[in-house]
Amino acid sequence: MTAGSTSPRPSARSASGRPKRGALLPTVIAVVVLIALFVGFTQVYTNILWFEQLGYLRVFITRNLAVIGLFVAAALIVAALMFLSLWLAHRHRPRGGEVTDTMRKYQQALDPVRKVVMVAVPLIFGLFAASTVATQWQTVMLFFNQEPFGQTDPQFSMDLGFYVFTLPFLRLLIGFLVTALLLAGVAGLLMHYVYGGIRIHERGITTTRAARVHLGSIVAAFLALQAVNFWLDRYSTLISSSGKWTGAMYTDVNAVIPTKGILAVAALLVAVLFVVAGFIGRWKLPLIGAAMLVVVAVVAGGLYPWAIQRFQVTPTEQALEKEFIQRNITMTRQAYGLDDTQVTPYDATTETEKGALRQDTETTSNIRLLDPNVVSSAFAQLQQFRPYYQFPEMLNVDRYDIDGQSQDTVIATRELNPDQIQGWYNQSVVYTHGYGVVAAYGSRVQSDGKPQFMQAGIPSKGEISDDYEPRIYFGEKSPNYSIVGGAAEDAPLELDRPQTNEGDAEDAKTTFTGNGGPNVGNWFNKLAYSIKFQSTDMLLSDAVRPESQILYDRNPRERVEKVAPYLTVDGKPYPAIVDNKVVWIVDAYTTAASYPYSSPSVLQDATKDTQTAQGTTAALPNERVNYIRNSVKATVNAYDGSVELYAWDDQDPVLKSWQNVFPSTVKPYSEMSADLMAHVRYPEDMFKVQRELLNRYHVTDANSFYANDDVWSVPNDPTQQNRNVSQPPYYLSMRMPGEKEANFSLTSSFIPQQNESGNTRNVMYGYLSANADAGTGKDGVKSENYGKLRLLELPRSSVVPGPGQAQNLFNSDTDVSQELNLLRQGASEVINGNLLTLPAGGGMLYVQPVYVQSSGDAAYPTLRRVLVGFGEKVGFAPTLDGALDEVFGGNSGAKTDTGAGVSEKAAEAAQGGKGKDSTPSPSPSGTPVPRSSSLQEALDTANKAMQDSDKAMKDGDWTKYGEAQDRLKRAIDDAMAQDGATK
């Protein structure tokens, strides 16, 4: 460089640009990490606010501390064992000696990062192992808080709590420790290999004393754990379902259980040999012991039990297995609450006679003609009033005392329809709640077939109550979230109810005054919930005031599941007006999967029926259980969302154990009001699980059970085109044979087990009812008869039609078909309602409402006919009374509810399509209603014309179609004229 020259100056861009580029990436990463952490924090923070507002913060804290504690403990145990194994292997590595080039390269690569690897690798594996253990927090909490069952198993005389609480925990613990030891062993083995503690060469494998002691101790610990596993296998035979029957059978008791004990002792002995070998350096004896252990496990644990089963049990299986089958029957019935089922032989007749129903007036007067799965659209058209309201697809059945008499009721809440509301402000601030309960008599309709409401309108009025809180802020169809409260008294923001003819000149508005959700008035809570719901509108809107609350997680099932995560919640909550407020009543279950000798059920499969298939009832989880109790009744206030849990089965050990985990969260049922008690009912999902078990476990004699020749099945729903789904149970008020009075009951029927060909007889074999009426009129006192199961067993020679056969009788009846075809004219649709089965008249009575729905968007079904079946006889009339009389010789002797059917005028209007046809209802059985030959000829002509019309339309021959329609019109006119002449 020449004198006077200056060194080149770096450009400003490069000088300033490189540091900026170098700092940009870490800055971006740091910002992203901070944002992610804050988003995660808001999820936890908003959960804390939600649980705290609801009064169940302890549940949130206890559950999360349990999960976090298990995760940390499991991760640390695995990491500590792996680190200790690595550290010991490195610390006791051989010094000096020959090292192969390959090993030297491994050591040179590992040494610079060895300390990091020895910490990081165990932590990574620990995190993976801990994630599995943490999901089992319920198993751990139940073990440490268990309550005894007070009953012992028939084999080991252990309290049943050992199998339900202790055994699952021990299995979890042993499985975790085995995993941790295997990871530690592999880690130590690799470290010994890399640093020369284990050398592989042509002469074989050589190990240092330190490596032998280290790895031998790990193998010994592994074998000791296997010994514990073998010992626990003895108890696990009582919950095994690997054979024909659940539980320890003859081979298990006499072969498997003894050999498992022998294997446990053998494994311990081999473990001791490995410890000794580690110190003395002689592996021959422990290796022989390990090989012998494998041989014994195969022979004694597999071949010997197989030989006992094949050559001793199979030839005389019934005699040898009888004792153990009886255990299975007894324990299964106990586990599912079937042990107190009252079985009554019922020699049902199929013969009819006049006055046969005179003794069943309490049953016939309560027969429900409104199908809650059909009339939802009728509720919507008659009571929805505005498009932003809706009713559920399936309504609910309850009962109310009206004028001192219990009335079965079809009931629903008028909830918001968020799909019809546009814009954030409207969705979140204005349209915040539904309004009112709508209820109709179950056993009567108006003269034109419409539901006869007992509670309806806006404002809500009726025979149930004129003075209750009608606002539905929490329901099955509520919006995702709403901002409520905080508005000035003179400037409310929430739409309360639409303009009506009751004096409201304009839409009424209101302000929520309850305590229903966390406060979002301060800026931090507002920011947290804006992030949670990804809404900038919430953050910027001036509609969010200092006193505003946010309502979310509003579905009753979801709220109960969150505050009681240990419960399985029934798929169908239902609303009731209780103590002048609307509450959702939610049934919840405690379950277990390791009740000894009890056969397992998969909840989702056992509860599957038409309603779950259609999505009108939530499906239960795909969980395998063998013990269930309806231990909790929960209520969710429809106005403020408050959740109350009541210990319905306060003797359930599983519930009592959970009460130890979450104290003061479940109240005794003695705190339930008389009004609430009156609306508690027997839960559907529990009943469906029980009836599924009764398909086999109605048999209580071991010999008969072994023969397996009396297996039942729940009939498929005959009203559905897809006949491969079970008929749902039905709520009915009726008097069972031998009882003094009618009770609100949940019912189902049984037919013989159906084979794949479908050729099995569809006849009635059994009829199950559960007393679903808990009310006594007193606070905190439930009826002694509530939950009582009664099973009517029909003779196996029964010719009483099952539901499928009864539906076929209805469908194949010529006169019924003719009238149904007439009802279908004018593009009307005929809808068969639920097929109800009732024990009455000394036999089984079938009743099915028939609805007609015209075409068009505003159409809804109305009752038009009632089908009745008894034996082979069918009645079909506008009224229930008329249909019963047709079956029972012209006078059934029954008393039916006022309005149990439609008027003759309405029936004529429906049948003729133009309001003129007055064809009397046919009487295919019993005492027939006389028809003139001219009238019958006209009906036959009409029927033929309809068939010709259908054929012409399918063929696309519109000329013949028009001719057939002309003949049909003339035939209908002739029929009306002839029928008028006979009156």
Curated annotation (Swiss-Prot):
Pfam family of the protein (one): UPF0182
Biased composition annotated in UniProt, kind: Basic and acidic residues: 947-959
Membrane topology summary: Multi-pass membrane protein
Chief localisation class: membrane
Transmembrane regions listed in the UniProt entry: 22-42, 67-87, 116-136, 172-192, 213-233, 261-281, 288-308
Keywords linked to the UniProt accession: Cell membrane, Membrane, Transmembrane, Transmembrane helix
Start and end residues of each stretch annotated as Disordered: 893-959
Locations listed in the record: Cell membrane
A Gene Ontology term for the protein's cellular component: plasma membrane
InterPro entries referenced in this protein's UniProt entry, alphabetically: UPF0182 (IPR005372)
HAMAP family associated with the record: UPF0182
Family statement: Belongs to the UPF0182 family.
Protein name, UniProt field: UPF0182 protein KRH_08700
Organism: Kocuria rhizophila (strain ATCC 9341 / DSM 348 / NBRC 103217 / DC2201)
